[in-house]
Amino acid sequence: MPASQSRARARDRNNVLNRAEFLSLNQPPKGTQEPRSSGRKASGPSTQPPPSSDGARERRQSQQLPEEDCMQLNPSFKGIAFNSLLAIDICMSKRLGVCAGRAASWASARSMVKLIGITGHGIPWIGGTILCLVRSSTLAGQEVLMNLLLALLLDIMTVAGVQKLIKRRGPYETSPGLLDYLTMDIYAFPAGHASRAAMVSKFFLSHLVLAVPLRVLLVLWAFCVGLSRVMIGRHHITDVISGFIIGYFQFRLVELVWMSSNTCQMLISAW
């Protein structure tokens, strides 16, 4: 045993790896696994920085864009119906504008059609009402004429306000006349001549005793005034229909605020 131990010591002494400068090679590498694992652990949570609020907002907007595009490509039923009715209105109004220009099919009748439209203008009606009011000598006549004057002024202000708000152009590029500028009847919606004709005809039918033929002629006159505005290209069909409706409601409003004979006499005396 002592001989074998001395032999082993001599073998270890003669081994090159037992020298001091080579001792590190005999030991297993320490910390080699830890840096790798620590590197993995460190690289795990720091793969990507947390998204900022701006990036999240942009991502959210990019997700919403296809939905908005789908909404535009697939409009609602109301939008389709409205656009269809608008297209029909424009098409039919252009077809009925047979006196819209010098090259139109009924260009020779343009002067006569414009004359029919002038009968529904506000300036002649206001001037005629004031003239009749000055010449009237009865209290009943003055009461009717004062309320008619109130209705005409209400019509001009209502139509001018709605036209200024909507600013719809006519089917043809026709410039308004001097009388149109005086009554602020510049745009197409609603048709001021149509609203005035409807209001005046309803006013006369309610407060004047007229024979049946005159009543029929009064209604036909209001219809022809509205049609003439479409024929010369100043209004669409829906503009005229809206004018008729507004004229009727104006008449109902005047009936609600009807001025009595005493009030009319006070206004006349003050004037």
Curated annotation (Swiss-Prot):
Tissues with expression: Highly expressed in heart and muscle.
Phosphoserine modified-residue sites: S43, S62
Intrachain S-S bonds: none
Side Extracellular, residues: 134-141, 224-239
Keywords: Endoplasmic reticulum, Membrane, Nucleus, Phosphoprotein, Transmembrane, Transmembrane helix
Gene Ontology cellular-component annotations: endoplasmic reticulum membrane; nuclear envelope
Expression induction or repression: Up-regulated during myoblast differentiation.
Membrane-traversing stretches: 113-133, 142-162, 203-223, 240-260
Compartments, record wording: Nucleus envelope; Endoplasmic reticulum membrane; Membrane
Main location: nucleus
Region (Interaction with MTOR) location: 70-91
CDD domains found in the cross-reference section: PAP2_containing_2_like
Cytoplasmic side: 1-112, 163-202, 261-271
GO biological process, one term: negative regulation of myotube differentiation
Purpose of the protein: Plays a role as negative regulator of myoblast differentiation, in part through effects on MTOR signaling. Has no detectable enzymatic activity. Knockdown in myoblasts strongly promotes differentiation, whereas overexpression represses myogenesis.
Subunit structure: Homo- and heterooligomer. Interacts with MTOR; controls MTOR-dependent IGF2 expression during myoblast differentiation.
Name of the protein: Inactive phospholipid phosphatase 7
Gene symbol of the encoding locus: Plpp7
